Every structure is written in structure tokens, then in C-alpha cells.
Amino acid sequence: MASSMSLKLACVVVLCMVVGAPLAQGAVTSGQVTNSLAPCINYLRGSGAGAVPPGCCTGIKSLNSAAQTTPVRQAACRCIKSAAAGITGINFGLASGLPGKCGVNIPYKISPSTDCNSVK
């Protein structure tokens, strides 16, 4: 159960990051978003000490590359927010810094308050 919640939270965080980045041709499923962000969960539940896990950055970069259209980015955002709502202990301060730490630049704040409809 905790693993499922962690995966959902990671999905939410990554999805928010993906909101600024594009998702590949066609639609991206919530399962794909969640799987891409799952490696980020333990980092986001911790103190932020140490490096971001390589798998986390790989997932963030992959989602960023995949989100090529506004509808796909908005859908990814919704998926991430939904998943994050089911995960406890996420440090959203760390989440907002993940894109930069992974070398990805997105023009949106990663936050539970992000309005997915405003994602372009």
C-alpha cells in the first residue's frame, strides 16, 4: 500500500514537472507517468540530502520529451496531481527543484496548487 502511494505521489510530482514539458506523440497514460516518476518518491520523502537518483532524472527527462502538446501536458499534470494526493510525506519544496537538478527547464511551478488548465 505504501509503495502504491509512493508511486502515485512520484507521479504527481513528475507530472507537475511534465506540465512544463511535452509528452510524446499521442496520449500518455497515468501509468506511464507514474512509472516514470516512481524513482523520485524516496528522494521526495527525504531531506533532500544527496544526489537525485539517476532513475528519477531519467523519468523526468523522458516525460519532458514526451509532452509535446498542450492537451498531453495538461493530462500529465492531472495525473500527477491525482497521484500525489494519495501519497503522504512528499516535500513539495524538493519537488519544485527536481527539474533543475535534472537539467530540465520548465516554466511552471511544481505544486499541488498548480492549475493544470493553465499549462500550455
UniProtKB/Swiss-Prot annotation:
The UniProt entry, under InterPro entries, shows:
Bifun_inhib/LTP/seed_sf, Bifunc_inhib/LTP/seed_store, Plant_nsLTP
Q: Which CDD domains match?
A: nsLTP1
Please name the SUPFAM superfamilies in this protein's record.
Bifunctional inhibitor/lipid-transfer protein/seed storage 2S albumin
One annotated GO molecular function is: lipid binding
For this chain, the annotated S-S bridges are C40-C56, C57-C102, C77-C116
Listed A to Z, the keywords are: Disulfide bond, Lipid-binding, Signal, Transport
UniProt cross-references to Pfam families, sorted A to Z: Tryp_alpha_amyl
Q: Which GO terms describe its biological process?
A: lipid transport; seed trichome elongation
Q: Which PROSITE patterns match?
A: PLANT_LTP
Q: Where is the signal peptide?
A: 1-26
Described by its record, this protein's role is as follows: Plant non-specific lipid-transfer proteins transfer phospholipids as well as galactolipids across membranes. May play a role in wax or cutin deposition in the cell walls of expanding epidermal cells and certain secretory tissues.
PANTHER family xrefs: NON-SPECIFIC LIPID-TRANSFER PROTEIN 2-RELATED (PTHR33076)
Q: Which family does it belong to?
A: Belongs to the plant LTP family.
Q: What is this protein called?
A: Non-specific lipid-transfer protein
Q: Which organism is it from?
A: Gossypium hirsutum (Upland cotton)
